């Protein structure tokens, strides 16, 4: 079996085209909008939750160009941090909607969430013909017409995300697995996982400053991996970043890139915050 590559895409300010504003389109918006992407939504009708949640500008009668019969709405105050749609086109899809004003710009992802499967397939092949095979396209409920799949996401705080994917075979089962993982974390008690991620990020940034040369990349990675393993899930949230950076400096400079850490018991007693 050929496997999928699971990646965490950075979509901030990237142009996304979503065709279809129904129930499935709404689920896509919940995942896409928080990424700060510049999303254009094409649909003649919208799910009742879309405007109040992601597109209040669409029915803002205070806008100078507001009209009841308007076909195109651009968010005048769009910002990647505001969790809003950038543009709404009140219409069925037309081929011309693939055009972008800036010829140097491009759609990062194109998705269809419409019940017309033949039209969805046509749009898929049109995108490939116009933009090349590398264009990322996703057709809802058609795994063969998907360059990527939406999995079941488990978010712990703002920074720790876990993706469960069945590679398009059974999204619901993926969601059940996600829920089981959530329950396991709940049973394990308060591990302060987001705090752990933040502190480990600070630690990695610090060791990059202490060992900035490219030739030191492998040592930095090996040191960070070994350090994380020694503290484990239960204790990473409590690490003392400053003390560990001092330890790194000694092991890197004075001990000639040593990976021989102090015993775990000593680490937990001397390199955790009081």
UniProtKB/Swiss-Prot annotation:
Pathway: Porphyrin-containing compound metabolism; siroheme biosynthesis; siroheme from sirohydrochlorin: step 1/1; Porphyrin-containing compound metabolism; siroheme biosynthesis; sirohydrochlorin from precorrin-2: step 1/1. This is Siroheme biosynthesis protein MET8. The keyword Lyase applies. Its EC number is 1.3.1.76, 4.99.1.4. It holds the Pfam family NAD_binding_7. One of its GO terms (biological process) is sulfate assimilation. Homodimer.
